[in-house]
Amino acid sequence: AYKITDGCINCGACEPECPVEAISESDAVRVIDADKCIDCGACANTCPVDAIVEG
């Protein structure tokens, strides 16, 4: 599954890109539900600050 690092600026660009709605908003950053993530990489490809990594 992909994960969102501390580099996240909480811009929200990734959330609508996720085909399985695995991304949600938390206090400071977005979070990815690893149980829902299908490893498609759509979120990582759209992140403007490269804060989403595989693993």
Curated annotation (Swiss-Prot):
Residues 2-27, 28-55 form the 4Fe-4S ferredoxin-type domain. [4Fe-4S] cluster 2 binds at C18, C37, C40, C43. The keyword Metal-binding applies. Disulfide bonds: none annotated. Keywords: 4Fe-4S, Electron transport, Iron, Iron-sulfur, Metal-binding, Repeat, Transport. Binds 2 [4Fe-4S] clusters. Coiled coil: none annotated. GO terms for cellular component: cytoplasm. Ferredoxins are iron-sulfur proteins that transfer electrons in a wide variety of metabolic reactions. This is Ferredoxin. It comes from Clostridium sp. (strain M-E). The lineage of its organism: Bacteria, Bacillati, Bacillota, Clostridia, Eubacteriales.
